[in-house]
From Swiss-Prot:
One of its GO terms (molecular function) is L-cystine transmembrane transporter activity. Its main location: membrane. It comes from Homo sapiens. This is Amino acid transporter heavy chain SLC3A1. GO terms for cellular component: apical plasma membrane; brush border membrane; extracellular exosome; membrane; plasma membrane; vacuolar membrane. SMART domains: Aamy. The chain crosses the membrane at residues 88-108. The lineage of its organism: Eukaryota, Metazoa, Chordata, Craniata, Vertebrata.
């Protein structure tokens, strides 16, 4: 009976097209039963005969494997040997994801803000008329700058800063702007500017440009409309009635121009006097007029749309004047008022840094913020307020919750006419002590409005000043030519007659020893080149291992690669009339840099007595004398030549900023600690 039943089942399955589930198992225990050896062969034959039904198999009706039924799948998956590993893997995955999320949140919360592009490396300031002439007309231009971008990148520069190139009159070195939206033909075309922006960005660099909001040229269309009282332009400038006595114009008050004499000039067209803080060809805009403020913001938007990465706002302390017309107070009160003609003879309490001026500057910052939303496209804003006291200058950083300038340009080192360890220390500490907490410092040793370093202090101080520049905390800023030690030009007959002192610092860049120092192929250049260009030029110094250019490149590279320099603490050790000594250090890095700079005559320094735990000998990481690089010197008797600088590297865990004795002598902008295990910075030190 059993055999007949088996046959019937097999026949039925064949008739159904062999839709069998060969993976089906009634009971797991059946698989573990040992078959009867005696019946194995018979059962196999019977089964084969029952299923196939003939000698030759017929697969025509066979369908694909249908899979395990749901009920069976649940039965298997519910068994302990499958369920437990599955649950373990699931909860391990959940735990891993939660750990990763928590770690990510912790890293973000504890990590300091990454340095922005304007903090990461040096800025290079270019006076475009003197950098490189591309069209043989004797004037530097925008194409010339583009041609020299490879040189700039070789210096490890991160930001190119170009001074005024707007369409302007020749007065005051192109700072009397006729059209803020046009490139002066001397420098090229708007297409040249756009190509320059693209080339700078292709090199991974950023571009900031000068912008002078305080005044325009008297040839500007706004002024022409204002002097004829045309519509809204009537009050775009500062106009007041003047009186006339014996054919002489009597101004409204005793306010003086920066260049001397009255800051009021009578205009015959309007029959009134207009106010000018600078030259009479540069009338001051009326920033108490909201339309003027909006016009300036529109100009900022125009250049931001062109792709510039930021602005240097010049002469911002002059934006507002007092509403009243009271006389400013004389420095020498016994001086006869009619003889007061020089700017330095008055206290300028009514014509500079007026209430509301910082609000205007903040509004410029807000305009730039509208273009700073894309990652990596933050728009920088710096301010120039020349000859301000440090406590007033740092006010341009803004308030804790109201941002203003990213930093006001710090030109106080470039104002030193004599140098010593004491004077350098005073400039450094004055800035760091007055700078608001959490703000970023910057340093300049030269600029277009000051005498060049070599001529001001002496050629022997070029290298040590550049070493100072790159080892101080913050952004180093270099005026073109300072990297090779260019000096002022000495010429009896200059092409243009303005302030001779500042004109001499704008001489053509010295590229090589060919005609015109490689600056131009023209027969005449707008200013003569310095007579020392045969020996002081880029090509010569490229091949000299001990040149100023080679040291500059080494310093720039060290600054870029060392967290101690670009993120670390600055701790002052000692200074006197000769030298200044300080350290750069960072929590988590068990070594420090000890910087020793001599600004006086030759001297002997005992460094071992300044810092406890110093070894008898210490290795020089970098020196103004390249022959000393890598050597070890006796720390108890370090001989320093005039203008010599040394950077020592010392392995220690005893950092100075943690010590009570140095607590008031250490500064840091944004506190950070380094984890060598994770290779990250964090703030919870």
């Amino acid at each position: 009976m059993a055999e007949d039943k088996s046959k019937r089942d097999s026949i039925e399955m064949s008739m159904k097209g062999c839709q069998t589930n060969n993976g089906f198992v009634h009971n797991e225990d059946i698989l573990e039963q040992t078959p009867d050896p005696g019946s194995s062969t018979d059962n196999l034959k019977h089964s084969t005969r029952g299923i196939l039904g003939s000698q030759e198999p017929d697969f025509k009706g066979v369908q694909p494997y249908a899979g395990m039924p749901k009920e069976v799948l649940f039965q298997f998956s519910g068994q302990a040997r499958y369920r437990i590993p599955r649950e373990i893997l699931f909860w391990l995955t959940v735990a891993s994801v939660l750990v990763l999320i928590a770690a990510t949140i912790a890293i973000i919360a504890l990590s300091p803000k990454c340095l922005d592009w304007w903090q990461e490396g040096p800025m290079y300031q270019i006076y475009p008329r003197s950098f490189k002439d591309s069209n043989k007309d004797g004037n530097g231009d925008l194409k010339g700058i583009q041609d020299k971008l490879d040189y700039i990148t070789a210096l490890n520069i991160k930001t190119v800063w170009i001074t005024s190139f707007y369409k302007s009159s020749l007065k005051d070195f192109r700072y009397g702007v006729e059209d803020f939206r046009e490139v002066d033909p001397i420098f090229g075309t708007m297409e040249d500017f756009e190509n320059l922006v693209a080339a700078i960005h292709d090199k991974g660099l950023k571009l900031i440009i000068d912008f002078i909001p305080n005044h325009t040229s008297d040839k500007h269309i706004w002024f022409q409309l204002s002097r004829t009282r045309t519509g809204k332009y009537t009050d775009y400038y500062i106009w007041h009635d003047c009186t006339h006595e014996n054919g002489k114009t009597i101004p409204p008050n005793n306010w003086l121009s920066v260049y001397g004499n009255s800051s009021w000039h009578f205009d015959e067209v309007r029959n009134q006097c207009y106010f000018h803080q600078f030259m009479k060809e540069q009338p001051d805009l009326n920033f108490r007029n909201p339309d003027v403020q909006e016009e300036i913001k529109e100009i900022l938007r125009f250049w931001l749309t062109k792709g510039v990465d930021g602005f240097s706002l010049d002469a911002v302390k002059f934006l507002l004047e007092a509403k009243h017309l009271r006389d400013e107070i004389q420095v020498n009160k016994t001086q006869i008022p009619d003889t007061v003609t020089q700017y330095s003879e008055l206290y300028h309490d009514f014509t500079t840094t007026q209430v509301g001026m910082h609000d205007i500057v903040r509004s410029f910052r807000q305009t730039m913020d509208q273009y700073s939303t894309e990652p990596g496209r933050y728009r920088f804003m710096g301010t120039e307020a020349y000859a301000e006291s440090i406590d007033r200058t740092v006010m341009y950083y803004g308030l804790p919750f109201i941002q203003e300038a990213d930093f006001p340009f710090n030109n106080y080192l470039s104002m030193l006419d004599t140098v010593s360890g004491n004077s350098v220390y005073e400039v450094i500490t004055s800035w760091m002590e007055n700078m608001p907490e959490g703000k970023w410092p910057n340093w300049m040793i030269g600029g277009p409005d000051s005498s060049r370093l070599t001529s001001r202090l002496g050629n022997q101080y070029v290298n040590v000043m550049n070493m100072l520049l790159f080892t101080l905390p913050g952004t180093p800023i270099t005026y073109y030519g300072e990297e090779i030690g260019m000096g002022n030009i000495v010429a009896a007959n200059l092409n243009e007659s303005y302030d001779i002192n500042t004109l001499r610092s704008k001489s053509p860049m010295q590229w090589d020893n060919s005609s015109n120092a490689g600056f131009s192929e023209a027969s005449n250049t707008w200013l003569p080149t310095n007579s020392d260009y045969h020996t002081v030029n880029v090509d010569v110094q490229k091949t000299q291992p001990r040149s100023a250019l080679k040291l500059y490149q080494d310093l720039s590279l060290l600054h870029a690669n060392e967290l101690l320099l670009n993120r670390g603490w600055f701790c002052h050790l000692r200074n006197d009339s000769h030298y200044v000594v300080y350290t750069r250090e960072l929590d988590g890095i068990d070594r420090i840099f000890i910087v020793v700079l001599n600004f006086g005559e030759s001297t002997l320094l005992n460094l071992h007595n300044m810092i406890s735990g110093l070894p008898a000998k210490m290795r020089i990481r970098l020196s103004t004398n390249s022959a000393d690089k890598g050597s070890k010197v006796d720390t108890s008797g370090i001989f320093l030549d005039k203008g010599e600088g040394l950077i020592f590297e010392h392995n220690t865990k005893n950092l100075l900023h943690r010590q009570t004795a140095f607590r008031d002598r250490c500064f840091v902008s944004n506190r950070a600690c380094y984890s060598s295990v994770l290779n990250i910075l964090y703030t919870s030190c």
